[in-house]
Amino acid sequence: MAKIKARDLRGKKKEELLKQLDDLKVELSQLRVAKVTGGAASKLSKIRVVRKSIARVLTVINQTQKENLRKFYKGKKYKPLDLRPKKTRAMRRRLNKHEEGLKTKKQQRKERLYPPRKYAVKA
């Protein structure tokens, strides 16, 4: 089997990808048997290509799965931890913009009763 390109895999359905994955795994097992029994050098060099192809198929499957989950949870209140933005621990605990702007009743009263003084400069 020739080297598989990820862009060709992205258009396929999940069933097709899983079938291709099974085919690649079967081919890999056959190549490993050939390696043990002393197969040709061309078969031995093909093991690497097949392994990388399996990795590509699995990567595409996982990426599409995660993309679908992102669409599903978009706009929901709670999201799974792996779909939330990866920030530092301190950034996750920081107040958001709305919470930063909130003022206590006492602070609001103080600002209302004692507004900043404005001075007129005589020219």
From Swiss-Prot:
What Pfam families has UniProt attached to this entry?
A: Ribosomal_L29
Q: Which GO terms describe its cellular component?
A: cytosolic large ribosomal subunit
Biased composition annotated in UniProt, kind: Basic residues: 86-96
Signal peptide positions on this chain: none
Matches recorded under InterPro entries? Ribosomal_uL29, Ribosomal_uL29_CS, Ribosomal_uL29_euk, Ribosomal_uL29_sf
Task: Give the keywords, sorted.
Answer: Cytoplasm, Ribonucleoprotein, Ribosomal protein
**GO MF entry, a single one:** mRNA binding
Q: Where are the transmembrane segments?
A: none
Q: Which SUPFAM superfamilies match?
A: Ribosomal protein L29 (L29p) (SSF46561)
Q: Where is this region: Disordered?
A: 84-123
Biological process (GO), any one: maturation of LSU-rRNA from tricistronic rRNA transcript (SSU-rRNA, 5.8S rRNA, LSU-rRNA)
Q: Which domain of life is it from?
A: Eukaryota
User: Where in or outside the cell is it found?
Assistant: Cytoplasm
Q: How does it assemble?
A: Component of the large ribosomal subunit.
Tell me the function of this protein: Component of the large ribosomal subunit. The ribosome is a large ribonucleoprotein complex responsible for the synthesis of proteins in the cell.
Q: Which family does it belong to?
A: Belongs to the universal ribosomal protein uL29 family.
**What's this protein's name?**
Large ribosomal subunit protein uL29
| Source organism per UniProt | Ophiophagus hannah (King cobra)
The gene from which this protein is expressed is RPL35
